[in-house]
Amino acid sequence: STHCISSAASDVYKRQIYEMHHRDFSVDSTSGVKNKGKYLALTEHGTMNSDKLLTGIDHLIELGVTHVHLLPSFDYASVDETRLNENSYNWGYDPQNYNVPDGSYATDPYQPATRVKEFKQMVQALHKAGIRVIMDVVYNHTFNTDESNFERTVPGYFYRQKEDKTLANGSGCGNETASERLMMRKFMVESVLYWIKEYHVDGFRFDLMGIHDIETMNEIRKAVNAVDPTICIYGEGWAAEAPQYPADSLAMKGNIAQIPGVAVFSDELRDGLCGPVGDKRKGAFLAGIPGGEMSIKFGIAGAIEHPQVQCDSVNYTQKPWAKQPVQMISYVSCHDGLCLVDRLKASMPDITPEQLIRLDKLAQTVVFTSQGIPFIYAGEEIMRDKQGVDNSYKSPDAVNAIDWRRKTTNGDVFMYYKRLIDLRKSHPAFRMGDAGQVRKHLEFLPVEGSNLIAFRLKDHANGDHWEDIIVAFNSRPTPARLTIPVGKYTVVCKDGVIDVRGLGIQNGPEVIIPGQSALILYK
């Protein structure tokens, strides 16, 4: 069958997404991969770093993620396929031909069948490993305008123009496509269906989705549902500049309630934790700076209406925008902006190596215990850094490549991420998937002071065999006290260690949360 995947991965609520670029993931000499930076890298089992720790696809299986999000893998213009010996690097947000794999990731770009076959081999290998494949799609603009396939087909039709007939530029890349025009809409729907039917792709991440109109995104969702409703669709609920189209008709974050079955990234949660994206030196909750707490609570609840989330205290929104929690992607970092390690260093110049590890773990614990769909950037699980580069779209491998020696030096961090992913997978309370259930079972607990957030998932939430789960996040450098309902609790996460078998017993009504860490208990 087209999607021979275990039901676990196809369950919307269980999704855990891992975002990667082909070169980043395997090009480094430490990867032990033969087909470095290629589609085929993801078909190689048994690859290891010099300390015999797993890399490549086996690393993904070990980590436990359910979906891999591949940065642009359709044919893009910014890497010359005839000069691959130059090792030039680009993320690939420069569309040339939408419906064919890019040749720079194939072993032979001159043989047309090679890229097709190798892309399919990659998808097949990931499917066999129980991992689904998400494509990053960039229908919002093309690399060229005058020379583009669209402009050559019907000049002036596929792109939006301003009143003065110059090109609109919602993408910030020179043009923006007109998804509301019937033939552009038809092109997008058919392109998505082609990747599903021909290449067995399981999901799509829409770049600058806020440039597309609501109706088109609903049409795409409808067409995809007819093939396989478990295929995921999410995107960036914003644009680079204001698109030339009525704002209330665009697939922006604030309108996502009108696009059921489509999710968007929560910059509220991200920046409530890390600080404003526009000022890398400015921290927030993780840096011990008060004020981000409500934005984080907004994210924990899944961007839905919740009686304890006061939206007037949330950083970027005055109202809940998601109808259902699965319409929110929770994350602290992605390919854009600083990776987590660099962000922590930028906002806390005096941070010690130990604090870096503690806050790194704390950040992802918030992400993976939130009701949205968790998303991590490749390499975060072994504390990758990009030397402080915040827009590495064409930076060399020296900046972008994952150094797999870090799996050895940061083995403890990797184990924490792996156990965090497993905790979420094993416990339905963390992924209720239904707004009514979240309002009923998720209760924020009162705390004293700032830089402390606590909540309870009560009464066997979503059929969880744990009756009550207490989760607390303390970003202060010192221990914090928390009052919890009386009872005998088993500790499963404390002081940077996770073990579902239990780390001891704790009795209410008062518990202590060590500084810069998360505490998770259940009864």
Where are these regions (language model features)?
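Conserved alpha/beta catalytic core and glycan-binding cleft of carbohydrate-active enzymes
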Residues: 221-222, 226-383, 389, 393, ...
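Catalytic cores of secreted or luminal carbohydrate-active enzymes
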Residues: 408-437
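Surface-exposed beta-strand/loop patches in extracellular or lumenal glycoproteins
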Residues: 475-487
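Single conserved hydrophobic/aromatic residue that forms the stacking wall/gate
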Residues: 2-9, 13
